[in-house]
Amino acid sequence: MWLIAVAIAAAEMQAPALPQWMAGCWESRSGETWTEECWSKPRGGMMIGYGRSGTGGLLDSWEVMQIELAETDDPAIDPITFYGAPGGLNRTAFSWVRESEPGITFVNAGHDYPQRIRYWREGRDLIVEVSLSDGSKARRWRYSPKGN
């Protein structure tokens, strides 16, 4: 029993880390419709990403993203922040929240939609879910490694 308590305490005390398991290019296809998301490997406390969607050879939408690790012990500063800018506009910050679910979750309850962004892996696939902060109005994408 004591070992379980020690293991739980150690897990809770682990420092936040950038989600290196997201690095790479990911793609989802359904007929002519496609969506892709690419993330750099962590470097210098940051991951840089982009997403784009389209049909055939036409681009429908795009977004630039960033995940930043703050090098601070100040509890007033979010240790990890996700930034998204659909179409390169209105860059919005989402704060990392510690959850028991696998993956990484970011929340900004003051944003219209999405308010919650969650990434996790299932086998080789990268799963992304966006929703309101209570989990309602969820949309989900399942990406496979691009080129496979």
Feature map (PLM): residue ranges:
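Sec-dependent N-terminal signal peptides
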Residues: 2-10
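N-terminal helix-cap/turn-to-beta initiation motif at the start of protein domains
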Residues: 11-25
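Short beta-strand segments and strand-loop junctions that repeat across beta-rich extracellular domains
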Residues: 18-22, 30, 131-133
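Central antiparallel beta-sheet cores of small beta-barrel/beta-sandwich binding domains
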Residues: 23, 28-110
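Edge beta-strand at a domain terminus
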Residues: 91, 101, 120-127, 131-148
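Short cationic/low-complexity microdomains
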Residues: 105-125
